[in-house]
Regions:
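Positively charged n-region of N-terminal signal peptides that target proteins for export
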Residues: 1-4
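Bacterial N-terminal signal peptides
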Residues: 6-19
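Active-site-proximal beta-strand elements of phosphoester/diester hydrolases
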Residues: 39, 43, 221-223, 262-266
Length: 339
């Protein structure tokens, strides 16, 4: 046993070192209404290609609005390559000074040193934007000190975990056939004057709708109308009534401070190609930062750099890509797979 101990310690040390061996991707803004704001984006899902969506959104907010945007990914601890869905996300300590968390994860069970900064951020009531699978962003064993963040947590004090208690809803199920049904996004008439909706029109998402029944106190801004095909012009699915697709709420933090939250059940990488949906996300960011007075219906939401989302059609994810391969304004998102 004495002989084994040094080896075990060496393995543990190596594993911890590997977990932290990927440098974060940072887009440094220069000027704009969000100048000086620190935004942290966490991307690690298995299906909807958050590793494409969040870097592009971060670029838009950095270049057009002046924010400093740090993008974190699920990382293969041995290679440093982006590994979507991997429960290893180095760099979450950036949340210590963050003004906003944008999260797009699915079924994560992070090591304590990576999960604790997220908990600390929520405990101080930091604003949160959650996209698509963030409603079931954590899947954590019952014996973990972070078990209450699990999307199926049963305890009444934090029922259904991070999704329900912070974002306003957990995973309920698909609403219509995913990959066969896209989603028209309609503004709720009673919410039309809300700042987040300024300039938003003709919004559409490639992804199918989710069942969603936001927690009491949520303000529903947009509903999802399932379509029978994968084009904005596809016919309406007459068997499906509108379902909540985007809402706002305030969550109560451990510090007692109320934290702003915006949630959308859409957000696949291809959804950002739609001007209406992209504006919705940009406006939601400014609102989350308390900058709603800066939201104008004609604010710049143009794409930054080559953006080629690949969710629709089931294209394979590019492999052997590191965060630094996405640096700067002009690198492709994502680059071609390395040969």
């Amino acid at each position: 046993m004495k002989r084994l101990l040094p080896s075990l310690l060496a393995i543990a040390s190596f594993t911890a070192m590997c977990r932290s061996n990927a440098a974060p991707l940072i887009y440094q803004g220069a000027d704009g209404p969000a100048k000086g704001k620190q935004l942290v984006f966490i991307a690690s899902d298995h299906e909807y290609k958050s590793e494409e969506a969040l870097p592009e959104l971060a670029r838009i907010l950095a270049k057009h609005y002046g924010a400093t945007c740090t993008v974190l990914f699920g990382i293969d601890p041995l290679t440093g390559y982006i590994a979507p869905g991997n429960s290893n996300i180095p760099g979450t300590d950036a949340l210590k000074t963050a003004d906003l968390l944008v999260i797009f994860t699915r079924f994560q069970n992070l090591p304590p040193e990576q999960m604790q900064p997220i908990v600390d951020y929520l405990d101080r009531g930091g604003p949160v934007i959650g996209l698509r699978t963030a409603t079931h962003g954590f899947k954590i064993p019952a014996d973990s000190p972070f078990a209450k963040f699990d999307f199926q947590y049963k305890g009444e004090e934090f029922k259904n975990g991070f999704g329900r208690q912070i974002l306003g809803e957990t995973w309920v199920g698909h609403y219509g056939p995913n990959h066969k049904s896209s989603t028209r996004l309609d503004i709720v008439p009673e919410a039309a004057a809300y700042p987040i909706l300024r300039g938003v029109k003709d919004a559409w998402a490639e992804v199918g709708a989710y069942n969603a029944y936001p927690i009491e106190g949520s303000g529903i801004l947009v509903t999802a109308q399932p379509l029978t095909g994968m084009e904005p012009t596809s016919p309406v699915d007459e068997t499906k009534k509108p379902m909540p697709a985007a809402w706002v709420r305030e969550y109560k933090s451990a510090s007692g401070k109320a934290g702003r939250a915006f949630t959308t059940t859409c957000g696949g990488s291809g959804d950002l190609m739609n001007d209406g949906f992209r504006r919705l996300l940009v406006n939601a960011t400014l609102w989350s930062l308390g900058l709603e007075n800066s939201i104008q219906p004609d604010n710049d939401i143009s794409l930054v750099g080559p953006f080629r989302p690949t969710w629709h059609g089931g294209a394979k994810r590019a492999r052997d890509i590191k965060p630094e391969d996405l640096a700067g304004w002009d690198s492709p998102i994502l680059p071609e797979e390395k040969k």
